[in-house]
A protein has these predicted regions:
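Flexible "cap/lid" subdomain of the alpha/beta-hydrolase fold that forms the substrate-access gate
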Residues: 2-6, 12-17, 29, 58, ...
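Conserved HGGG/HGGXW glycine-rich cap/lid loop of the alpha/beta-hydrolase fold
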Residues: 20-69
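Conserved short acidic donor-positioning loop in nucleotide-sugar-dependent glycosyltransferases
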Residues: 259
Length: 287
């Protein structure tokens, strides 16, 4: 472990990732992983509240989103590379194990990182998206398959990008239907559509077919909280209910009432408190 120092970027796989490193430098580290179609900016409100609780937050713009970390081809976005990115970030920090948090696709990366490298994760908080195995089981046994229709559309090459760029009103109505505010939608237009991150973000979906089946069975052995909101149009309650079956450690399911999919912005105060409780409980457990 090295003395804490601020970082603005980290390197991995020949790529350069942008990082927001804020909060008390000597605080316990919370790594916040964003999802689609957003950047690390989506964590701003939650991060500020965690700073008030004494945490240092590390928020990367992930693979496909950072301007210098946009490899071509969907194979470069398979789960093993996303985990390796997160491991490289934690190694760059040099502060030892972290409290790992992920929302949406960031939750997928967080689940897989905690399963593969529990030595680097003190606690895990996942938001919206459950363990990959729970998600698949929900697809086969609930309305999750219908909710996930867009994932199949995103498998098409270049057509989703063309549709999103050529029909901005359709994008606006679609995102508004998920609970996004006008300000959030404008941010998506600026950061993702105009900012050149659209294909990279979609490639996370397109790489799903390359992910190793073992990820569906991987066990998580660190204290974990999964957060699901009942206003989420993309993820079913059943998917959340199944998540705990993949955790061999202290586990809690938190259900937020009247909150949409966009929990880090819409319910930042509640989420920061949940992250703090998960981290505090994990830190107090005997090794």
């Amino acid at each position: 472990m090295t003395a804490p120092r601020r970082i603005a970027t980290f390197d991995h796989d020949g790529l350069v990732f942008d990082v927001r490193d804020t909060g008390p430098l000597d605080g316990d580290v919370v790594v916040l992983l964003h999802g689609f179609p957003q950047t690390g900016a989506s964590w701003a409100d939650t991060a500020a509240l965690l700073h008030q609780r004494g945490y240092r937050t590390i928020v990367p713009d992930q693979r496909g989103y950072s301007p210098r970390a946009r490899p071509r081809g969907r194979f470069a976005y398979r789960s093993s590379r996303l985990v390796a990115d997160t491991v490289a970030l934690i190694d760059t920090l040099g502060t030892g194990p972290v409290h790992l948090v992920g929302h949406d696709w960031g939750a997928v990366a967080a689940w897989s990182t905690a399963a593969r490298r529990p030595d680097l994760v003190t606690s895990l908080t996942t938001v919206s998206v459950p363990h990959p195995g729970a998600f698949l089981r929900a697809m086969l046994g609930s309305d999750q398959l219908v909710r996930s229709y867009y994932m199949f559309l995103f498998q098409l090459p270049w057509l989703p990008e063309l549709a999103i760029r050529s029909r901005p009103r359709v994008l606006e109505r679609t995102l508004a239907g998920t609970g996004m505010t006008p300000a959030q939608i404008d941010q998506v237009r600026q950061d993702i559509v105009r900012g050149g991150a659209l294909t990279g973000g979609l490639n996370w979906y397109r790489a799903m077919v390359f992910n190793h089946p073992a990820a569906l069975r991987a066990r998580v052995t660190v204290p974990t909280t999964h957060v699901w909101s009942d206003g989420d149009t993309a993820l079913s309650r059943r998917s959340a209910e199944l998540a705990g079956q993949y955790v061999d450690a202290a586990y809690r399911l938190e259900i937020l009432s009247g909150v949409s999919h966009w929990v880090p912005e819409e319910a930042a105060t509640t989420l920061a408190a949940i992250i703090d409780r998960t981290a505090t409980d994990a830190a107090s457990r005997p090794v």
